[in-house]
A protein has these predicted regions:
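Feature captures hydrophobic
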Residues: 2-197, 202-203, 209
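Conserved SAM-binding loop of SAM-dependent methyltransferases across substrates and taxa
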Residues: 229-240
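Conserved SAM-binding strand-loop segment of SAM-dependent methyltransferases
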Residues: 264-277
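Substrate-binding/catalytic lobe of Class I Rossmann-like enzymes that use SAM or dcSAM, i.e.
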Residues: 325-434
């Protein structure tokens, strides 16, 4: 992007804060902030407001602001200039240095703007010098962003260790997921046969579809890998009379799934085991196998070994249904902010492309004969989850901490946008064991 002389900046920002006498005044901080924000967002197509750390309000663009971007710390503005990528914004939102009021989905589009923003070095240095005068001021987070003692990460910096990422995704109580997953507790893509269907209806449709694709018959043996909360295992046993062996490495999910099996009177059909897929015996004893969204959490390097274990567990000719999130860019790479978010939830996870998945399936001696793209269904699923999560904001923040709520909200919104844009996909593959 070419540099712009100072007098070429049309400054589409307007100052909205007035003094008590009604006269509009600007301090040195406001002048510098105005200049910096004007340069960073001069080409941004959506109108929005900015509330600075001292309460001053600026508006960007024409029309009614879609959201208000609240900078609680002057240092965030400095970092926005210096790093010129959305990762710092993501970190700042999670830590409470940034607040978003209004349309959160629209605010997330700022990530794309920063992905494409390229400032010449001399111009970036000029903006940084301006920003440094702001960052030297001591800023204190306002009371409404104060860290809550319920979350172990509230005293940590915005950059969270990967071990905490595991805790965010796996080591949280079941009632957290119950608040937003839906009554079926299906932590994966639902299937909306109609856009008017509820989340519960769409989840039931997905469970039925999976069982039908696997051609489940009374007396079949089904291996449910990463069985989660036991939803598919109980559904298949209850509605199709199959024997299900579900495995999960998550103690919380294991306890919940066991309880569901007992409460639904399915102990004669369903066995839930706390185990890793790597411990599966190579007995070739299962008629069918299903794996709902584990590959995207494994990491690409582990996928061949995982498929080899599934192959060894199935009978020759057995059916395998794999339900996988894929990266739709050629290199299977993520932008910086998405990578940061995913590290908070699934630090070991890594998406790969659909083409690479097919290659892995073939190398593992699976013949893929049915593929369905479920990207639009995941968009609708995420919207429903997000609505549920936001409706439970107060209770989640009280029990899990504001930071945990923000990371999950950010992750769901970012995921929905990526599915909408086709950056990521969801593929349901059905294959036979050679």
């Amino acid at each position: 992007m070419s540099s712009y002389p100072v007098n070429a900046l049309a400054m589409p920002l307007s100052l909205e804060q007035s003094t008590a006498s009604g006269d509009i005044t600007e301090s040195g901080d406001i002048i510098h902030a105005r200049y910096i924000l004007n340069r960073l967002f001069q080409d941004y197509p959506v109108a929005f407001a900015v509330r600075l750390w001292n309460g001053s309000m600026l508006t960007i663009g024409d029309g009614a602001p879609a959201f208000t971007f609240c900078l609680e710390q002057a240092s965030v503005l400095r970092d926005m200039v210096w790093f010129s990528n959305p990762k710092r914004l993501v970190e700042a939102y999670c830590s409470g240095e940034v607040q978003i009021q209004g349309d959160f989905h629209a605010a997330m589009q700022l990530r794309e703007h920063f992905e494409s923003l390229s400032l010449p070095l001399h111009e970036k240095l000029g903006l940084v010098f301006r920003a440094l005068t702001l960052a030297n001021n001591q800023q204190v987070l306002p009371e409404h962003t104060a860290h809550t003692p319920h979350s172990p990460t509230q005293s940590q910096s915005a950059s969270v260790p990967s071990s905490h990422g595991i805790a965010l995704s796996y080591d949280v109580p079941e009632d957290f997921y119950q608040r937003w997953l839906g009554e079926q507790m299906l932590h994966s893509c639902a299937y909306f046969a109609s856009p008017t269907h509820t989340l519960a209806q769409a989840q039931q449709t997905q469970l039925t579809l999976i069982c039908q694709k696997l051609h489940l018959q009374h007396g079949d043996t089904l291996l449910d890998i990463a069985c989660g909360w036991g939803t598919l295992a109980c559904w298949a046993a209850k509605h199709y009379g199959v024997f299900v062996h579900g495995i999960t490495h998550n103690p919380t999910q294991y306890a919940y799934a066991l309880k569901q099996v007992q409460q639904q009177g399915l102990t004669h059909l369903v066995k839930i085991e706390l185990a890793d897929y790597r411990t599966l015996p190579a007995l070739g004893s299962y008629d069918k196998a299903a794996c709902i969204s584990i590959a995207d959490h494994l990491g690409a390097a582990h996928y061949p070994d995982f498929l080899a274990k599934v192959h060894a567990a199935l009978k020759p000719g057995g059916l395998f249904l794999s339900h996988v999130i894929t990266a739709e860019n050629p290199a299977g790479q993520q932008d910086a902010s998405t990578a940061f978010i995913n590290r908070q939830l699934y630090p070991a996870g890594e998406l790969t492309s659909f083409a690479h998945l097919l290659q892995h399936m073939d190398s593992a001696r699976f013949d893929v004969f049915n593929v369905e793209g479920l990207r639009r269904h995941y968009v609708m699923t995420l919207r429903q989850w997000l609505a549920n999560l936001e409706a439970q904001h107060a209770s989640i923040a009280a029990s899990m901490g504001e930071r945990t709520y923000r990371i999950w909200r950010l992750a769901m919104t970012a995921s929905a946008i990526q599915f909408e844009q086709g950056v990521t996909g969801m593929h349901q593959m059905l294959a036979t064991r050679r």
